[in-house]
């Protein structure tokens, strides 16, 4: 199937043939009919990507800081690889679309094949022929819904959340600063709710368009003389009950202007990307104004449990989640309480998406909403995609399931480039990643399904996915009679471990876990010097903090840091003393999120050795990450 992508390094935009998306649990696969270009968010992303490296650095100072931090922690080589990986990658674009359901995943009950739906979410609702989207980022549409209008789903939900943050009542007034897509959508939602809407924009054309299409009650060009007094008069001398800033600018004018036109104890809601360093006097302090932010589509946004796992918030306690915001927006469209049609000033066939984005970047003519239309008659290919002319097979023929940052930095570059090793297939959740990795590392194809990887060509499978899928992929690979290399941990559940042991004994195939530290040259020297005599050992890891909402900390997906990472150090101590553990005890310090990732572990071994693993998530960044000592060693590592 085809997908629009952009390379961050050069800004090049390409419609690529990429693998058909995988259907995960709690997800649906949708054939797109329309997708909408966010001329603000996507426009700035595309524009920044086309700048020089210096221009990119100026545009994204926070990412420059991340690079510097990585350099301090991991050194120049790993930092260079990480930066180049990012710059060389083709990233998907798009986050708002509509279409019809063509497949339904496990556990999905609210959608069936053939349903009309609207979808949201960067990385999900892409500009692509086919998308795979979690259920809480999709809404079912009325059978009579206009799919072009419905494709404004994400933008509508963002505007809706801004309106909800303003918390206005019938008869109250609101000034909207910025009459682009978000501003005009928010204005229509407010008008449908009985609120008097006053629109302000730096573009007279935007103001005129909003007035002509009845999106606002009154409109003003920002440079209109005496604009503050005019708004005071309209609001009977009080000022607006709320101001919604839907502009995108580096100027402080919107936030200070909002203070000037809001009433005493009024609200200012920031919906767009603007700085908030307002002047305290003469308005903000004396009026005791309330500044509120609108977080994207609404409650549930950026929450892994809500968006990826599909765990809803109870309606009596969280009335308007991001999904319910989308549903409310779609209801306003289908009941004709708001008018979306006039917002679409340009429509391009998907094949001409480059021209659409060139219009956004160059601004060669006025535009508001830009829709991409898809060929829904053509059936997208589900076949694997060839990425190399070579079909050579070696003694060892490798395929990868999962090829994210770790695999690209620490596994794939070190596969021997000899005739004994054949590079067969790549399978990842992201079609763009599969394609790029397969091409970069000279694999024969990128896959669309597991069976492509577990075919007769492959005899060795590398598994580098998220931790929760390790166990099942190891088991499937063994049952397909493959040797397996799996990144740590091998699995998360004891039941999975038992099944793997049973299957390995049955097939006799090799299963290797990525405990790479035992193979380092220095470790080999230490091992040779110390032998297998009983010893006391200390392994201190200054691991650093990982946020509680990171997938690694999720007990179901990452398993937590003890299962996910500390297993590595237990293996190291086991290797160093040449004996297996017989007793383990641990003690963690309390933390607010019950992560238990700052702890001491005491391990006793069969040969009488003992080891302490001191794993600290709260250590100083200035301290070395790793320290290994032993009474049998002369030096520290």
Task: Report each predicted region and the residues it spans.
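Rossmann-fold NAD(P)-binding glycine/threonine-rich loop
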Residues: 272-288, 490-509
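Mid-domain Rossmann-like dinucleotide-binding core that forms the NAD(H)/NADP(H) cofactor-binding site
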Residues: 123, 146-224
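Short N-terminal strand-loop motif that marks the start
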Residues: 1-92, 335, 369-384, 634
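A glycine-/small-residue-rich N-terminal strand-loop-strand element
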Residues: 78-89, 96-122, 635
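Beta-loop-alpha module in the N-terminal Rossmann-like domain of NAD(P)-dependent dehydrogenases
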Residues: 245-254, 447-501
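Predominantly a Rossmann-like dinucleotide-binding segment in NAD(P)-dependent oxidoreductases
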Residues: 299-317, 517-587, 592
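N-terminal Rossmann-like dinucleotide-binding module
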Residues: 379-441
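Conserved small/polar residues in nucleotide/adenosyl-binding loops
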Residues: 628-635
């Amino acid at each position: 199937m085809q997908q629009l992508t952009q390379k961050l390094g050069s800004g090049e935009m390409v419609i690529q043939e990429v693998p058909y998306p995988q259907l995960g649990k709690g997800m649906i696969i949708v054939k797109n009919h329309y997708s909408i270009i966010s001329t603000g968010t996507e426009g700035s992303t595309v524009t920044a990507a086309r700048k020089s490296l210096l221009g990119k650095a100026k545009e994204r100072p926070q990412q420059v800081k991340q690079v510097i931090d990585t350099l301090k922690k991991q050194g120049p080589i790993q930092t260079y690889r990480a930066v180049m990986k990012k710059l060389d990658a083709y990233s998907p674009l798009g986050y708002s679309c509509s279409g019809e359901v063509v497949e339904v995943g496990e556990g999905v009950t609210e959608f069936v094949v053939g349903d009309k739906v609207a979808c949201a979410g960067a990385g999900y609702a892409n500009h692509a022929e086919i998308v795979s989207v979690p259920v809480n980022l999709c809404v079912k549409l009325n059978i009579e819904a206009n799919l072009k209008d419905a494709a404004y789903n994400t933008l509508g939900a963002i505007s809706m959340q801004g309106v909800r943050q303003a918390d206005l009542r019938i008869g109250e007034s609101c000034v909207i600063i910025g009459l682009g897509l978000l501003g005009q959508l928010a204005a229509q939602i407010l008008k449908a709710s009985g609120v008097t809407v006053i629109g302000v924009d730096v573009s007279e054309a935007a103001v005129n368009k909003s007035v002509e299409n009845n999106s606002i009650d009154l409109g003003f060009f920002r440079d209109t003389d005496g604009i503050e007094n005019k708004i005071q008069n309209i609001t009977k001398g009080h000022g607006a009950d709320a101001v919604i800033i839907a502009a995108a600018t580096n100027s402080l004018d919107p936030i200070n202007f909002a203070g000037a036109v809001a009433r005493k104890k009024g609200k200012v809601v920031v919906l767009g990307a603007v700085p908030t360093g307002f002047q305290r006097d003469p308005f903000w302090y004396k009026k005791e104004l309330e500044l509120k932010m609108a977080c994207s589509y609404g409650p549930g946004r950026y929450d892994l449990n809500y968006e990826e796992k599909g765990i809803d918030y109870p309606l009596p306690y969280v009335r308007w989640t991001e999904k319910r915001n989308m549903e409310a927006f779609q209801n306003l469209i289908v009941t004709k309480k708001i008018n979306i049609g006039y917002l679409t000033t340009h429509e391009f066939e998907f094949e001409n998406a480059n021209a659409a984005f060139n219009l956004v970047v160059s601004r060669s003519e006025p535009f508001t909403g830009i829709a991409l239309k898809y060929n829904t008659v053509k059936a997208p290919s589900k076949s694997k995609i060839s990425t190399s002319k070579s079909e050579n097979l070696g003694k060892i023929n490798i395929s990868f399931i999962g090829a994210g940052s770790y695999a690209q930095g620490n596994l794939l570059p070190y596969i021997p480039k000899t005739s004994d090793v054949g590079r067969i297939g790549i399978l990842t959740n992201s079609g763009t990643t599969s394609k790029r990795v397969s091409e970069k590392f000279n694999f024969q194809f990128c896959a669309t399904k597991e069976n492509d990887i577990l075919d007769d060509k492959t005899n060795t499978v590398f598994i580098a996915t998220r931790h929760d899928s390790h166990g099942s992929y190891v088991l499937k690979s063994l049952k397909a009679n493959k040797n397996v290399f799996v990144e740590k941990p091998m699995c998360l559940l004891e039941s999975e471990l038992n099944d793997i042991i049973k299957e390995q004994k049955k097939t006799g195939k090799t299963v290797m876990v990525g405990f790479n530290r035992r193979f380092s040259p220095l470790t080999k020297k230490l091992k040779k010097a110390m032998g297998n005599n009983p010893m006391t050992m200390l392994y201190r890891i200054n691991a650093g903090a990982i946020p509680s909402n990171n997938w690694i900390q999720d007990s179901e997906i990452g398993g937590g840091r003890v299962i996910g990472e500390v297993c590595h150090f237990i293996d190291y101590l086991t290797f160093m003393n040449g004996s297996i553990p017989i007793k383990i005890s641990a003690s963690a310090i309390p933390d607010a999120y019950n992560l238990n990732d700052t702890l001491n572990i005491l391990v006793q071994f069969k040969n009488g050795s003992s080891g302490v693993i001191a794993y600290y998530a709260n250590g100083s960044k200035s301290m070395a990450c790793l320290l290994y000592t032993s009474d049998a060693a002369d030096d520290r590592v």
